[in-house]
Amino acid sequence: MTAFFLTIFIVIIVLVIIGLILFMLLEMKREKARLIKSLNMALFLVRLPKEDISGEERKQDKERIAVMEQLISSFATMHEGGWKGVVSGQPAVVLEMAVHHIGEEIHFYIAGPVRSAELIQRTVHGFYSAASVERVQDYNIFNPHGTHAGSVLTLAKRYFLPLRSYVTLESDPLNNISNALSKLEREGEGAAIQVVMQHAGNSWNKKAFAVARLMQRGKSYEAAVSEAAGGFLGFLKELSGGVGGEDKKKKEADEKAKTSLTPLAQETIKGIEGKASKAGFSVNVRLIASAPDALRAERILEQLENAFAQFSHPAWNGFKPRRVKGRALRNLLYNFSFRVFSEDEAMLLNTEEISSLYHFPISTLQTPRIGWLKAKTAPPPENLPEAEEGDGVTIGDSLFRGQARAVRMLREDRRRHLYVVGQTGTGKSTLLSEMIRQDIEKGEGVGIIDPHGDLAELALSLVPRERIKDVVYFNPGDMERPVGLNMLEAKGEDQRDFAVQEMIAIFMKLFPPEVVGPMFEHNMRNAMLTLMADPENPGTIVEIPRIFTDEAYVRSLLPKVQDPVVRAFWEKEMAKTSEFHKSEMLGYLVSKVGRFVENEMMRNIIGQPRSGFNIRDIMDNRKILIANLSKGKMGEVNSSLLGMILVSKLQMAAMARGDITQEGRADFYLYIDEFQNFTTDSIATILSEARKYRLNLIMAHQFIAQLPENIKNAAFGNVGSLCALRVGADDGEYLAKQFEPAFSQQDLLNLDNFNAVVKLMIRGQTSRPFNTLVHKPWERGVKPDLQAAQALKEFSRLTYGRAREVVQKEILERSQLARPVAAPSAMTPGESNK
């Protein structure tokens, strides 16, 4: 008998040891599985736009917070069944609100298993359609040289009793929580609130409803909890409700008890049933703070803990912070960093309670430093050209809900022109340079007019070495080898009339209207037409003063003049003009033309009878024209004059292509930065007509107020594609009408650098507006070839420029500038127009 009991004892001991070993192995396996699961979490940064909310809409705050409750409820479907669920635990969803140790914005994150990453992203977008849900690398709140503090929130009472929630609180509970996070220093201090959730199943609901039923029968809350949660037999007994004749007596007792319940008991029952009616989660709530010293870290943590006091209900439940130290703190920081769910920290909260302590910010939240989405995003059109489709350029990527698509403009659509607007430093030059690079590499004809010089210099460095001979670099600052540019160089009567009209328009734009009147226009028109009469030996602007002072020179030109009106101007009108009035006229003209004639740099460019390069040849043979018209080096008026002459000559060359078929007209892409400086009233004609002649414009500038009303109307009325980077308030108001309803004025004001809102012409149809991230060449391995750029400059100046001494001698001979002329009368500008 003794041997039998001894055997039984040994068997029990062995089974206990085996059980302990199996338990330890299971725990080790579970710990390993938890770690693997933690390392396989996808982290998303969630940002929402802060929209203007009216008074009526402010009343809907609770409805907005309820959206978060619905989102959390949807995660109840994430369940792991079978042995895998036992070993590795249920999948967790993690909600975090954090301020990094460098930076001051309050960021909102959501994390979940990598295998569910797409589901999480899609679900968040389903409830928050305007949100940006961006997968990101992990962040850091910890000061590497500082001290850390941490707390775990626990429930003050059993989970049956609910907390105060957003439904009963008067204001958004996130105000207090986020305010605590908004008081951190920009560097060296960080903090986070972490909510780790696992679905709790359904058994807790049954127990909670059982407690409510027992209280309805007159039992106190404590007695009801003790019986409902007092073990399996007690729970079955409560659920069975008795048998036989006892049912009727119990129902009568229940009815009697209901009538004797105190108001507090009735409210408690209602609260328990309300909590149990919603999905529940096992939750860890961790508060972490980091600062340069322990005192400051503890202070930050205390402010976070105090922010959760608002959820305490005097008769029901509340949070009880448990601050940890030493080894327990190290374990807490480990669990926080790896987002590990801990049974020891778990408490049961329903979706209403969780969404009260954590929800994405709503627009009425007044806390500063919230990491709002600066501008909304919109999906790209379905008919965006694919990478292999057609012949075009890529301007960036459309990033929408984690999906990236290249944004391309096809050749045919580019013929309807592109308008780009954005403040300085927002990425305009980057966009232009990337498009220029692609055009040059594809062998396209390209023109660049740059009033700053940086884009021109960059474009030079992007030219492949095999295209060096295609480049014409027009740099007025190179005074040793000036390149000629003569506006009075024209073929045929139509071109002469156009050139004169443009030159008049240029002067009217460069000078105030009160000093450029009808007499100035009349005299200048006849003078220029006379100088242009001999196409083999055209005159220049520099010779205009001479034509009014040298009668012999006029007589030498008149035989070439075929226009009877122009001849009559000299033979009749000027012949009858007194010397005094001629002198007065000369003074008036010199006051306008003289500023260019007297400037050596300008004189050596516009005084050459033959332009140093043939623009028609550049366009037809797909060459590259780069004009560096740096205002800082040559002055704004000089830069504008040369730029407008270039644009006018390009327009003349384009129109002259009417002598060849459309199929034979090579596309020429003209990039004009600060285009308002280089356009006259004829811009409307260029935009509407140049498409036929394959002159395709890409126009950029900083703000719409720079544009005269007629040019603004011409641009917005004729341009096929619009691209707006960040703009100011006035421009935002104007452009919002172009991009509604997808984007508002606020969106356009808050775009990050290199982000743009575009409305493209796609296969002849205008797309709906969408957002684009501009490609950054330096991130795509594009390296400027500075050595080649220098070689290009040298090749171009030797090919198209002429020696300074030769040019000066020629101009002096033609213009007779060294010859004394009658002194201009001392008169006020515009006096001759009276």
Regions found by a protein language model. Name each.
Residues R47-K50, V114, V195-H199, V283, ...:
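Flexible glycine-/small-residue-rich
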Residues A307, F311-P314, L348-L349, V463, ...:
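Conserved ATP-driven motor cores of ASCE-family P-loop NTPases powering translocation/secretion/packaging/pilus
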Residues D785, A789-K834:
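Acidic, low-complexity intrinsically disordered tails
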Residues T2-L384, M479-P482, P559-V561, Y588:
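Extended, folded cores of ATP/NTP-driven motor/assembly subunits in large transport
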Residues D397-Q403, R411-D413, L418, Q423-T424, ...:
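P-loop NTPase motor domains
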Residues A387-A406:
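N-terminal pre-Walker A segment at the start of P-loop NTPase domains
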Residues T123, F209, A297-N306, W316-R322, ...:
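Composition- and surface-driven signal marking solvent-exposed, interaction-prone regions
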Residues G188-V225, V516-E521, R525-K560, R768-A791:
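Charge-patterned, long linear interaction tracts outside catalytic cores
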